[in-house]
């Protein structure tokens, strides 16, 4: 089975529209783009188009590529103070002279659309999932939507980034999966992946995972986006692995749409949290 990320994202967007209607106002998302990275510009356009579809008011703040740290932090602090901005997203990567960790820590935890703030990451590790990284949240949503029994399952994640691998491991542990986290430095990677019932690959290595590394009937989520001979491919040898997997996400059209849809959901969550604070 091909796991259609676009179809799942459409379901999420329908849920988000209903939540926006119940709120009675349009939540606000502010994105910050530093520089003119073409890929980042494309991702920003995709996110703002998605906001428009579900009734989220969005604005994009573009800063020059030579923006200094002080200016970026002040821009974020200004958005923190605005009542009409419920969620803030800092588009990564930043230019090399800027420290993404300092910038992320400047975002108010209550407005942290990406779930990268240490306070939100800490809550996740303690089992309190408030605002969490969007890609892991999308993967967990897909597993639950497909009726996969996460509890007790053998889950292997290839990739230990702060964006995908680490937070996804915490989310799966919170649901009582048995989790292994591997990476490109793992010795004998096949020995780990071949028994996985849930396999998530986010290593940034084109077609790293071959068919003989995958268990029959596994659910495989390919987070990789790589360019090979002008084509976009993932970290999984899709054509070979799809014959063995119970479900597999394509690249493109798999995890990417889920990530964007979860950004919308988290923006509404941030607005709902803001409303609760006002009422209490």
From Swiss-Prot:
GO cellular component terms, A-Z: cytosol
Gene3D superfamilies found in the cross-reference section: Leucine Dehydrogenase, chain A, domain 1, NAD(P)-binding Rossmann-like Domain
CDD domains referenced in this protein's UniProt entry, alphabetically: NAD_bind_m-THF_DH_Cyclohyd
Stretches of the chain forming a coiled coil according to its record: none
InterPro entries on file: Aminoacid_DH-like_N_sf (IPR046346), NAD(P)-bd_dom_sf (IPR036291), THF_DH/CycHdrlase (IPR000672), THF_DH/CycHdrlase_cat_dom (IPR020630), THF_DH/CycHdrlase_NAD-bd_dom (IPR020631)
Keywords annotated in UniProt: Amino-acid biosynthesis, Histidine biosynthesis, Hydrolase, Methionine biosynthesis, Multifunctional enzyme, NADP, One-carbon metabolism, Oxidoreductase, Purine biosynthesis
Reactions mediated catalytically: (6R)-5,10-methylene-5,6,7,8-tetrahydrofolate + NADP(+) = (6R)-5,10-methenyltetrahydrofolate + NADPH; (6R)-5,10-methenyltetrahydrofolate + H2O = (6R)-10-formyltetrahydrofolate + H(+)
EC numbers, comma separated: 1.5.1.5, 3.5.4.9
Functional summary from the UniProt entry: Catalyzes the oxidation of 5,10-methylenetetrahydrofolate to 5,10-methenyltetrahydrofolate and then the hydrolysis of 5,10-methenyltetrahydrofolate to 10-formyltetrahydrofolate.
Quaternary context: Homodimer.
Stated name of the protein: Bifunctional protein FolD
UniProt source species: Methanothrix thermoacetophila (strain DSM 6194 / JCM 14653 / NBRC 101360 / PT) (Methanosaeta thermophila)
The organism's taxonomic lineage, starting at the top: Archaea, Methanobacteriati, Methanobacteriota, Stenosarchaea group, Methanomicrobia
């Amino acid at each position: 089975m091909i796991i259609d990320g676009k179809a799942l994202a459409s379901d999420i967007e329908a849920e988000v529209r209903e939540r926006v209607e119940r709120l009675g106002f349009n939540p606000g998302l502010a994105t910050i783009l530093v520089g003119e990275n073409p890929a980042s510009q494309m991702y920003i356009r995709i996110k703002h188009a998605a906001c428009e579809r579900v009734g989220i008011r969005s604005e994009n703040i573009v800063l020059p590529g030579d923006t200094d740290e002080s200016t970026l932090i002040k821009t974020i602090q200004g958005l923190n103070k605005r009542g009409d901005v419920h969620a803030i997203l800092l588009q990564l990567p930043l230019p090399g002279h800027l420290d993404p960790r300092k910038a992320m820590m400047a975002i108010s935890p209550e407005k942290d659309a990406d779930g990268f703030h240490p306070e939100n990451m800490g809550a996740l590790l303690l089992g309190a999932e408030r605002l969490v990284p969007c890609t892991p949240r999308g993967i967990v949503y897909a597993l639950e939507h497909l009726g996969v029994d996460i509890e007790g399952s053998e889950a292997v994640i290839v990739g230990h980034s702060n964006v995908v691998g680490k937070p996804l491991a915490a989310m799966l542990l919170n649901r009582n999966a048995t989790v292994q986290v591997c990476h490109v430095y793992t010795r004998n990677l096949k020995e780990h992946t071949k028994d996985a019932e849930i396999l998530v690959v986010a290593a940034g290595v084109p077609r790293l995972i071959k068919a003989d590394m995958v268990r029959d009937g596994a659910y495989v989520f390919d987070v990789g986006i790589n360019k090979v001979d002008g084509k976009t491919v993932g970290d999984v040898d899709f054509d070979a692995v799809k014959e063995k997997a119970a479900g597999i996400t394509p690249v493109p059209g798999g995890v990417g749409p889920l990530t964007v849809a979860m950004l919308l959901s988290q923006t509404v969550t941030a607005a709902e949290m803001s409303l609760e604070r006002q009422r209490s």
